[in-house]
Amino acid sequence: MANYRSTIRHRNSGSRKSVSGDTHEVTRVRTPQKDRNEVLATVLNLLGSKRVTLQCMDGVVRMGRIPGSKKKRMWIREGDIVIANPWEIQDSKADVTWKYTRPQVEWLERKGYLN
């Protein structure tokens, strides 16, 4: 049994790739769509319980909610750029629908989406 575990550990040890040295060109970036009422936002605070404080590009500070389907896949930290979808009923709240990676944020800055 010990031999089996050591071979698996040895076989999988080289499968990790370093992310820090990986520089690749961004070809397609999802942009906020006005017809879906989407807006770019920056995460100010993590409030806990799937809630964050967002500073939206339209000048409104909203409480954002991370839907349960995206909670495990989308790890959000302070300072991240996200797409928020404001609620129709309450304008002070929004759903977080997309999180940008670092190369995508650089692309958005170059193209003028972020002020």
Curated annotation (Swiss-Prot):
InterPro entries, per the entry: NA-bd_OB-fold, RNA-binding_domain_S1_IF1, TIF_eIF-1A, TIF_eIF-1A_CS
A Pfam family per the record: eIF-1a
Residue ranges annotated for the S1-like domain, each copy included: 27-101
Cited PANTHER family: EIF-1A
CDD domains, per the entry: S1_IF1A (cd05793)
Protein task: Seems to be required for maximal rate of protein biosynthesis. Enhances ribosome dissociation into subunits and stabilizes the binding of the initiator Met-tRNA(I) to 40 S ribosomal subunits.
Top-level taxon: Archaea
Gene name per UniProt: eif1a2
Keywords, comma-separated and alphabetical: Initiation factor, Protein biosynthesis
Biased composition (Basic and acidic residues): 22-34
Record-stated family: Belongs to the eIF-1A family.
Gene Ontology MF terms in the entry: RNA binding; translation initiation factor activity
Disulphides: none
Protein's name according to its UniProt entry: Translation initiation factor 1A 2
Protein biosynthesis keyword on record: yes
HAMAP family: aIF_1A
Gene3D superfamilies: Nucleic acid-binding proteins (2.40.50.140)
